[in-house]
């Protein structure tokens, strides 16, 4: 099974792709989708343009690596409500790209991911990076956004099957995908 992990962000969205064979994990790819800067030519204020870049970037990653499922971080309510709304829009663009690619999507909180990867939910980003490096036998530390995305893929590899059986992971079925694509939600 191939899992695509997504750590959504409006400026930088991390992605990580992991193959799972039984209990063995194999690193495939990781990186980021950036929505501002020279490569995009977009300014911080161009929200619709940045969301399109994010949608297109996640769509391209899904098409290139052909995952069988995806895991996305659930956002938390920030102190700044405006930041939370912007992050929610970025997450929505990423989720829409995954659903458009007909991928089942599992969702995990940062606390769940950190607990699964490091062993406790209050782990620092550097601890997540180091454990992802060790678990996937990487030669160096991945960037923080890519490490979080790889951590989400690892979390789903270890917990997804068992959690799905007891209904703790929200997954979209193929029938639901078809209904959403057709504009129906009954």
Curated annotation (Swiss-Prot):
Task: State the active site.
Answer: 7, 73, 145
Offer one example of a GO biological process linked to this entry.
DNA recombination
Q: What are the record keywords, sorted?
A: Cytoplasm, DNA damage, DNA recombination, DNA repair, DNA-binding, Endonuclease, Hydrolase, Magnesium, Metal-binding, Nuclease
Q: Which residues bind Mg(2+) 1?
A: 7, 145
Q: Which InterPro entries match?
A: RNaseH-like_sf, RNaseH_sf, X-over_junc_endoDNase_Mg_BS, X-over_junc_endoDNase_RuvC
Q: Which Gene3D superfamilies match?
A: Ribonuclease H-like superfamily/Ribonuclease H
Give an example GO molecular function: magnesium ion binding
Origin superkingdom: Bacteria
Cofactor details (free text): Binds 2 Mg(2+) ion per subunit.
Q: Which cofactor does it need?
A: Mg(2+)
Q: What is the uppermost EC class here?
A: hydrolase
Q: Where does Mg(2+) 2 bind?
A: 73
The chemistry this enzyme catalyses reads: Endonucleolytic cleavage at a junction such as a reciprocal single-stranded crossover between two homologous DNA duplexes (Holliday junction)
Q: Where are the transmembrane segments?
A: none
The family note in this entry says: Belongs to the RuvC family.
Task of the protein: The RuvA-RuvB-RuvC complex processes Holliday junction (HJ) DNA during genetic recombination and DNA repair. Endonuclease that resolves HJ intermediates. Cleaves cruciform DNA by making single-stranded nicks across the HJ at symmetrical positions within the homologous arms, yielding a 5'-phosphate and a 3'-hydroxyl group; requires a central core of homology in the junction. The consensus cleavage sequence is 5'-(A/T)TT(C/G)-3'. Cleavage occurs on the 3'-side of the TT dinucleotide at the point of strand exchange.
- Protein name as catalogued: Crossover junction endodeoxyribonuclease RuvC
Protein source organism: Acidovorax sp. (strain JS42)
Question: Which gene specifies this protein's sequence?
Answer: ruvC
């Amino acid at each position: 099974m191939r899992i695509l992990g997504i750590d959504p962000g409006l400026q930088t969205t991390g992605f990580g792709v992991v193959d799972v064979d039984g209990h063995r994990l194999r690193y495939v790819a990781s990186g980021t989708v950036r929505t501002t800067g020279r490569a995009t030519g977009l300014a911080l204020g161009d929200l619709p343009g940045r969301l399109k870049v994010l949608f297109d970037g996640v769509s391209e990653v899904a098409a290139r690596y052909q995952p069988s499922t995806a895991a996305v971080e659930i956002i938390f309510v920030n102190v700044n409500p405006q930041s939370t709304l912007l992050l929610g829009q970025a997450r929505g663009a990423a989720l829409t790209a995954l659903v458009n690619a007909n991928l089942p999507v599992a969702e995990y909180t940062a606390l769940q991911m950190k607990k699964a990867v490091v062993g406790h939910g209050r782990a620092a980003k550097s601890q997540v990076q180091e454990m992802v490096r060790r678990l996937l036998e990487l030669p160096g530390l991945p960037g923080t956004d890519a490490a979080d995305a790889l951590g989400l893929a690892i979390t789903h590899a270890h917990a997804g099957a068992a959690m799905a059986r007891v209904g703790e992971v929200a997954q979209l079925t193929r029938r639901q995908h078809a209904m959403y694509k057709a504009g129906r939600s009954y």
